[in-house]
């Protein structure tokens, strides 16, 4: 896997987010960071990059396979998804490349209590 955590979220070539890579990181996030969350709903969004719908599909499948309910918000701004999930004390997964080149993409994770922290990265990476 050639994806890695950067300044804000998981980043890498879009092709490297297809299939098992997206699923492994989403599952690790839920298992490690969200294990004690009573709500079993995860809010999921995507940006307008060509690769984002496919990556979001892999993320949704991983969320379901982990026993959670994905709620797909569609193409929404990252802060809107984060605020919506935070107001409901639920985790969120946003597929977005933000400012990086079009052939790259990324996944941002949001904890039920807010921002995914730098210290959250290693446990998720190690589990993935």
Question: Across the structure, where does each feature detected by a protein language model lie?
Answer:
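Gly/Ser-rich phosphate-binding catalytic loop and adjacent alpha/beta segment
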Residues: 2-128
